[in-house]
Amino acid sequence: GGEMTTVAVRLARAYTKKEKIMICGYHGWHDWYLATNISNHNNLDNHLLPGLNPLGVPKALRDTIIPFNFNNFEDLINIVKERANECAAIIMEPARNSLADKSFLNEIRKIASKNNCVLIFDEITSAWRNDTSGIHKELGVNPDLATFGKTMANGIPIAALIGKKKIMEQVKNTFISSTNWTERLGPACAVAFIKKHKRLNLGKILQNKGKKIRDIWTQSAEDSNLKIKIDGILPLSSFKIETQNKDDWPIIITYFIQEMLKKKILASDRCYSNYCQSDGLLD
């Protein structure tokens, strides 16, 4: 996934002849992405993890990556609208802990088009959950490029990039390569998965399982007199136990994972719905 977002950014820079990139979400571990923390170690706090150290990333990349916050209309006006003309691309996840606001995406689409800025949707996590494709189809906002990852092959390593021909053809003008591009297991698994996804209407099944997981969490919290907050699209649900001190959460979730392991269950604060989760297993 990280390699494919890097390819998308490379093509956007080749196409626009600009260098700066706006980001909103988690797009991998590569230098181009982590470079945003050179100027401010807190830049990725709301996108990945707090306090990530960009040690080893060339300082020459300082100020080449501009972050903005998900569904934040103030950032939309003060950052995206003001600086899009400097940027080769806006790359973002159309679903993070929740679906992007459609008006937020529509405005970003307009800004990108107006400023010769490639709009990239990172669908590595969000695709194939609600539907047999990217979640941008559900939202009705089309990017210029979109990236997909191993979900499309049921977990077998694979990544894909789709997009407008005029941008994709920049691959002829730059250098992109991979040792594993001639490997065929991933594509074969992807074809089989997509066919089965369509046949089973798997998106609907995953949504129903996600709702059941949420119902179980809600009831368990009520039974234990706990206040929880549930986020995410249904197939990618997560929870957080709310306390007076927000710094308690890392301790709470560590304890939760520890106690679940004692029950021989590998669990955290999020659950990715899958076809094999029976009602009995979820209960």
Annotate each PLM feature.
Residues 194-218, 246:
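Structural signature of PLP-dependent enzymes
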Residues 72-78, 94-115:
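Active-site core of PLP-dependent enzymes with the aminotransferase class I/II
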Residues 198-200, 259-283:
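PLP-dependent enzyme catalytic core of the Aspartate aminotransferase-like
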Residues 77, 172-183:
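A short glycine-threonine-serine/GTX helix/turn-capping micro-motif
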Residues 1-86:
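PLP-dependent aspartate aminotransferase-fold enzymes
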Residues 139-171, 182-189:
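Active-site PLP attachment segment
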Residues 210-214, 221-256:
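Conserved PLP-binding catalytic core of the aspartate aminotransferase-like
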